[in-house]
Amino acid sequence: MKTDTSTFLAQQIVRLRRRDQIRRLMQRDKTPLAILFMAAVVGTLTGLVGVAFEKTVSWVQNMRIGALVQVADHAFLLWPLAFILSALLAMVGYFLVRKFAPEAGGSGIPEIEGALEELRPVRWWRVLPVKFIGGMGTLGAGMVLGREGPTVQIGGNLGRMVLDVFRMRSAEARHTLLATGAAAGLSAAFNAPLAGILFIIEEMRPQFRYNLISIKAVFTGVIMSSIVFRIFNGEAPIIEVGKLSDAPVNTLWLYLILGIIFGCVGPVFNSLVLRTQDMFQRFHGGEIKKWVLMGGAIGGLCGILGLIEPAAAGGGFNLIPIAAAGNFSVGLLLFIFITRVVTTLLCFSSGAPGGIFAPMLALGTLLGTAFGMAAAVLFPQYHLEAGTFAIAGMGALMAASVRAPLTGIVLVLEMTDNYQLILPMIITCLGATLLAQFLGGKPLYSTILARTLAKQDAEQAAKNQNAPAGENT
């Protein structure tokens, strides 16, 4: 009898413990799980929208080029049509940005950095359509812009949209989903999941709040974004340069010299971007008519340039494999480099919706290939392959300009599938970053954000000053 009683009591104790465990589980904070679920949703949406953006931009470009092919035998029609088509497409992008969502202009990455610090608003309901359609216009016009900036900003805004749809109010969720969307956006633009994660950790390190949930959320979003991208585009590297040879140890000093060159070029490039922005601001003075006409002229110029020298127009993804293969002479590489520096400054600094990553990668490829070809002539005993310097140069300019060497290294290796070049990449990017910092260069996106915040404060001060006296008393 005592045994039965003891058994019964033991069973009751087990049941009570189970009930207590279930009760504790039910009462536990579900916020981390909810954030991870929403991160998966954000990553999936960003991947879908990123692929859609890529496809629609390609469609617009093909339609424009197809129209030009129809009149290719009639020069008196071809040149004016090339200018008009690109000008009209560009004007659509400039008008939408200026009229409906000024924060959608430019890359959009500084806006996300500002939003992570809660210094810039996130108005996803107007940024998403304007950035998508405006980017279709400017990139479809053949302007020297990349799609990574728009995709990062679109991803961040999708993160805020999902947050609002699920009515989450916690600051942690707001910050985490914004960062998740941005990382997923970069991953969707370049098929580079690890670079997307590093971009948030490295480039946005002052704004990103490190904790276990935020890191897991970023990983989750990037995974989903990459899966969606690969479902639609396959698993091949986004830039096909083939398998390049390894860099022998006795040639590594050349990569350090290349890094020193880019360490000088990066700060100069950043300074030119900022000065060109000031020049455009003085020209249009915020007047929408002047701004749109200016954008149309720049777009039309890119359309004409695409006929004269196709390598000098467009984002640069088509140019990179051709240049890296050594199909141009050193003189032509330097000429295209200078031409694309000018067109990049005109397109990006004018405030067109579009990124600068892809143009910078193309510029790095051009200068890196030129250096590699010159080094091969000067040091024939090394049997150098110019393509390896092209790969190193791709990441070096980004490292010196954006001050994100890890992201630059991993991004280029993921895009080209040449992981054996990681050592020369590290040497080149580290040399470029250290010299750029020594010369006093500032990270491009951080500088643009600081200028945006200064302008925002000045506008707010002007509003307060112009407020009726009755409101101030």
From Swiss-Prot:
The annotated site for Mediates proton transfer from the outer aqueous phase to the interior of the protein falls at E148
Which InterPro entries does UniProt cross-reference here? Cl-channel_ClcA, Cl-channel_core, ClC
Where is this protein localized, as stated in its record? Cell inner membrane
Per the annotation, the residue ranges of the short sequence motif Selectivity filter part_1 are 106-110
Keyword set, alphabetical order? Antiport, Cell inner membrane, Cell membrane, Chloride, Ion transport, Membrane, Transmembrane, Transmembrane helix, Transport
CDD domains the UniProt entry points to: EriC
TM ranges are 33-69, 77-100, 124-141, 148-166, 215-232, 253-281, 288-309, 330-349, 355-376, 422-438
Renumbered ranges of motif Selectivity filter part_2: 146-150
Catalytic activity annotated for this protein? 2 chloride(in) + H(+)(out) = 2 chloride(out) + H(+)(in)
Which residue stretches are annotated as topological domain Cytoplasmic?
1-32, 117-123, 167-176, 202-214, 282-287, 439-473
GO MF, one term, reads:
voltage-gated chloride channel activity
Q: Where does chloride bind?
A: S107, I356, F357, Y445
Site entry: Mediates proton transfer from the protein to the inner aqueous phase? E203
Chief subcellular location equals: membrane
Task: Describe its membrane topology.
Answer: Multi-pass membrane protein
Q: Which PANTHER family match?
A: CHLORIDE CHANNEL PROTEIN
Record's subunit section: Homodimer.
- State what this protein does: Proton-coupled chloride transporter. Functions as antiport system and exchanges two chloride ions for 1 proton. Probably acts as an electrical shunt for an outwardly-directed proton pump that is linked to amino acid decarboxylation, as part of the extreme acid resistance (XAR) response.
Cite the NCBIfam families for this sequence.
Answer: PRK05277.1
Q: Which family does it belong to?
A: Belongs to the chloride channel (TC 2.A.49) family. ClcA subfamily.
List the protein's name: H(+)/Cl(-) exchange transporter ClcA
Lineage per the UniProt record: Bacteria, Pseudomonadati, Pseudomonadota, Gammaproteobacteria, Enterobacterales
The record's gene field reads clcA
